[in-house]
Regions:
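Heptad-repeat amphipathic alpha-helical coiled-coil interaction surface used
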Residues: 90-92, 97, 142-144, 149, ...
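A glycine-/polar-enriched beta->alpha junction
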Residues: 75-84, 91-106, 118, 126-144, ...
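Transmembrane beta-barrel architecture of outer-membrane proteins
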Residues: 71, 123, 169, 214, ...
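Small/polar, glycine/serine/threonine/aspartate-rich low-complexity segments that form flexible
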Residues: 55-66, 109-137, 141, 251-269, ...
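Periplasmic alpha-helical coiled-coil/stalk elements that build and connect Gram-negative outer-membrane
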Residues: 138, 154-278, 375, 379, ...
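Amphipathic alpha-helical coiled-coil segments and their boundaries
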Residues: 72, 79, 86, 131, ...
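Terminal intrinsically disordered/low-complexity segments used for targeting and assembly
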Residues: 1-75, 230-278, 441-465
Length: 465
């Protein structure tokens, strides 16, 4: 075979065997993405279709007339950019499995030339080297990448739960801030009436000036509290929109509801202490730490396997002076100067770190479960006390009205009783808010919704490819 024929054959084989991916540009414009973010809407028909595919949700009409926790959480799963980042990271981790599974490519070398003083004698040489991995290195790489990919998928679930938790807390905060403003407006009206009646009695010489001054100061202070509460409504509204992943303007005009916010469950009805064991074994951060530990195990196995050198098998061919020569060369690295001790020691240390992180994650879960249950029980007890106080003051208010109707009390006494009831109602509302927030901490510790009627805690599919 002539040298030029050999070269043509090799070139043809190389070109046929190479099928590289083509680069596709994906330009991104900050101005365009900002416009897309600002144009997000809860009325988006694509959101409607995606929400229906999540199971347990059936919109009576679209756009929704009201938005509750279930629908707002689904909207957050659709819009929140943190989930997009987590999904992208999970996809990158999946791609790492492909990288780990790749086998090393063979190499080829061609060396044509001429021999003799006149260069009339052609020479052609062709060498082919096929690397062969030994000791199961490829399998350990795949196992390592697979466990890290699983950890990344679990982190996606962890991010989804965090999004749900933030939406829940933000919705509770907003609804209770609106309720606080309503109560404060009513209390301001009562304070005004109290000041008016006190002024009348002062001018009649029935009360001293300090009593009137105190009433006026209380009214001024309450108005300042109302002004701050109005600002808090706007702040919590914006916080809820941010938790969903939409601009504040997209949430304007939407009717937000939570039908059972006033009736949190009794602490005794919460999952029993056996739920601690379930959380210790199944919370996503624990499972993620376990996958990272298994990845560290595979990493250590890979470094140990690297003690055994790979083999290169190299069949060769040469043509010289009209004769064909075949050869077979087997080569390998001689592990004389080191046996990969350093990387093995690092991998062993990384496995210890991963084991310690798993234990720390379980310890955190245990503390979270116990602390959140205790915090909820305390908040619920405070709520019960505040509810009882409201009931007592409402009875006193009714008694004052009865005395007024019987001519045995004046209007100021009734207004004073109404003010006491109003203050106690605000205290009860604050206790209810703290109870609901504490209940959210219990859900976070167990990483599952305590209301069986709500939708899944995690999205079933990605809203975008």
């Amino acid at each position: 075979m002539k040298p030029h024929a050999i070269g043509a054959l090799l070139l043809s084989a190389l070109l046929t065997g190479c099928a590289p991916h083509r680069y596709h540009a994906a330009p991104i414009s900050p101005a365009a993405t900002a416009t897309a973010l600002y144009s997000r809407s809860l009325d988006d028909p694509d959101l409607d279709q995606w929400m229906k595919g999540q199971g347990g949700f059936d919109a009576p009409s679209w756009p929704l007339p009201t938005w509750d926790l279930q629908s707002l959480v689904l909207a957050a799963y659709y819009f929140n950019p943190d989930l997009d980042v987590a999904r992208a990271n999970a996809t990158a981790s999946d791609a790492a499995i492909t990288t780990a599974a790749m086998k090393p490519n063979p190499s080829v070398s061609v060396g044509p030339g001429y021999q003799g003083p006149s260069g009339a004698q052609p020479i052609a040489a062709f060498d082919f080297s096929l690397p062969i991995e030994t000791a199961g290195k490829r399998g350990y790489r795949i196992a390592n990448a697979t466990h890290l990919s699983a950890a990344s998928r679990l982190q996606l679930g962890q991010t989804a739960w965090t999004v749900r938790s933030r939406v829940r807390a933000a919705l509770i905060d907003y609804l209770f801030s609106v309720k606080a403003v309503e109560l404060l407006h009513r209390e301001v009206d009562l304070r005004k009436e109290y000041v008016r009646l006190t002024e009348t009695r002062y001018h009649a010489g029935e009360v001293p000036l300090p009593d009137l001054t105190t009433a006026r100061i209380d009214l001024t202070s309450l108005r300042q509290t109302l002004s701050a509460a109005d600002g808090h409504v706007q702040t919590t509204h914006a916080a809820l929109a941010a938790a969903i992943g939409i601009p504040d303007s997209a949430l304007m005009g939407k009717t937000l509801v939570w039908s059972d916010a006033d009736s949190p469950p009794d602490p005794n009805s919460l999952p029993p202490q056996s739920a601690r064991k379930l959380a210790l074994e199944n919370r996503l951060d624990v499972l993620g730490a376990l996958e990272k530990y298994e990845a560290a195990q595979s990493g250590l196995q890979l470094e140990i396997a690297k003690q055994y050198p790979d083999i290169n098998i190299g069949p060769g061919y040469s043509y010289e002076e009209g004769s064909n020569f075949l050869s077979l060369v087997v080569s390998s690295v001689l592990p004389l100067r080191n046996h990969n001790e350093g990387p093995i020691a690092e991998a062993e240390a990384q496995r210890k770190v991963a084991g310690a992180q798993l234990l720390a994650a379980q310890s955190t879960v245990l503390a979270d479960v116990d602390r959140s249950r205790a915090q909820y029980a305390a908040a619920y007890a405070t709520l019960e006390g505040a509810t009882a106080t409201v009931g007592e003051l409402e009875q006193q208010q009714q008694s004052a009205l009865s005395l007024l109707n019987a001519g045995e009390a004046d209007q100021l006494t009734v207004v004073a009783a109404q003010l006491q009831t109003s203050v106690s109602e605000r205290a009860r509302m604050d206790a209810l808010l703290q109870t609901q927030l504490a209940l959210g901490l219990v859900e976070d510790a167990l990483q599952r919704p305590l209301d069986s009627g709500v939708t899944s805690a995690f999205p079933k599919s990605a809203p975008r490819p």
